[in-house]
Structure formats: structure tokens, C-alpha cells
Amino acid sequence: MVQSKEQRVHGVFEKIYKNYDQMNSVISFKQHKKWRDKTMQLMNVPKGATALDVCCGTGDWTIALADAAGETGEIKGLDFSKNMLSIAEQKTESYSQIELIHGNAMELPFPDNTFDYVTIGFGLRNVPDYLTVLKEMARVVKPGGQVVCLETSQPEMFGFKQLYFLYFRFIMPMFGKLFAKSFKEYSWLQESAREFPGMKELAALFEEAGLKNVQYHPFTGGVAATHVGWKR
């Protein structure tokens, strides 16, 4: 039986959850933490803010949001992998302002206009439909609030672009096999990264989702980028 994208992705993350954090550091050469820190600086989250972290995984960005919003903030992390959430639960035990929810990014279980910020980090490329998820994120953010995506992207510089795809297609899956015994799963991750829209194309999807003043900020030669859009 041919698996849907959603089924395949769910299987990937249910399997790799124990090594996910370690592999993120290996694959990105620890750059993903710097990218997230720079994104948080762009967002400028105040104390007491409300935020939803979609596809929160093991909770790193959820925790960063909670640290910024403080004890008076209200942060929710949502993911469809119970195994990934189990790691997030361990990491967020001391955060009373964080609530973790098992749910689907395609149908967010929240009313319209609920959050000041809605984020998704390295998760959008894995959903069945990018635009549907962006529309859902735009729906639940408050007017004037921010929808923020940190994701792998497509470098445009000749030479660097070719090296990037060589790394993702051949070397990254080998790292998965070596460090996490998961060659097949990390082969999927390189496929999803390779097929993901470039920065300009993703910015257009943000606008199609109804967001305004869309900006994007490339990192490390364009191997990753943050996109920010505001709700009208």
C-alpha cells in the first residue's frame, strides 16, 4: 500500500524521536540554534505574550517562546507525533506556562484570533499542504500578530547551491545511518527539504494565506530562512 505524505512523515518522527535533537545539531553543524535565536530577536516577544508553536517536536522553540514571554505568558506546543511530544514533556516540566497538545497542523484546535504569535520551525516542509497550514496559522493568530516560519530553503548562489544539494541528498542520510541507525528516515528528510519552495515562493504563499508585510531573512547562504507575516 502506498503511504500518504502524512502517514510517511508520522512514521519518520515516531521512529527518530530519541535522536532528533542530536541529529539536528549534526546535520546543521549546530547552526539551527543560531537561526532560532536570530528569529526570536526578529520577533521581539514581550512578557505576557501568547504563542502557539506548530509542529513543536521536542519543544526547543516552545521553550524559547516561554523564556521570552515569561511566567505571565501562555505558550502552547502542538505536534502530531506522541513520541516527539514525550521528549518535549520531559524538557518542559518546569514551565507552568507551557501546554503541549497532540494535534494536527492542518486543523488547529483553537478559535480564530487566539495568539499573538504562531510559529512553525522545520515542520512546514513535512505537512501535506503548505498553504492549508499557513491559512490555519493565520486564522488563529490575532489581528496585528505574527506568523513565523523557520525552515530549510533553497540556496541561490551557484556552486554553493550544488554543494548544498549534494550534502542533503547523499551525506545527510549517511549521517542518519551512522548516528541514528535511520538511513531511510533521513532520506525522507532530504527529499522534503529538496522539494520545499524557495524563499520568494514561500513568501508568496504567506501572502496567499492572507498575511501582509511579509519579510524573509536568509541564513548561512540561504540554506535556511525565516519568514514573517502579519495578520491584517
UniProtKB/Swiss-Prot annotation:
Pathways per UniProt: Quinol/quinone metabolism; menaquinone biosynthesis; menaquinol from 1,4-dihydroxy-2-naphthoate: step 2/2
Positions annotated to bind S-adenosyl-L-methionine: T58, D79, N104, A105
Top EC class of this enzyme: transferase
EC number: 2.1.1.163
Pfam families: Ubie_methyltran
PROSITE patterns in the cross-refs: SAM_MT_UBIE, UBIE_1, UBIE_2
GO biological process, one term: menaquinone biosynthetic process
Keywords: Menaquinone biosynthesis, Methyltransferase, S-adenosyl-L-methionine, Transferase
InterPro entries cross-referenced by the UniProt entry: MenG_heptapren, SAM-dependent_MTases_sf, UbiE/COQ5_MeTrFase, UbiE/COQ5_MeTrFase_CS
Catalytic activity as recorded in UniProt: a 2-demethylmenaquinol + S-adenosyl-L-methionine = a menaquinol + S-adenosyl-L-homocysteine + H(+)
GO MF, one annotated term: demethylmenaquinone methyltransferase activity
Similarity remark: Belongs to the class I-like SAM-binding methyltransferase superfamily. MenG/UbiE family.
Protein role: Methyltransferase required for the conversion of demethylmenaquinol (DMKH2) to menaquinol (MKH2).
Listed name of the protein: Demethylmenaquinone methyltransferase
Species of the source: Bacillus licheniformis (strain ATCC 14580 / DSM 13 / JCM 2505 / CCUG 7422 / NBRC 12200 / NCIMB 9375 / NCTC 10341 / NRRL NRS-1264 / Gibson 46)
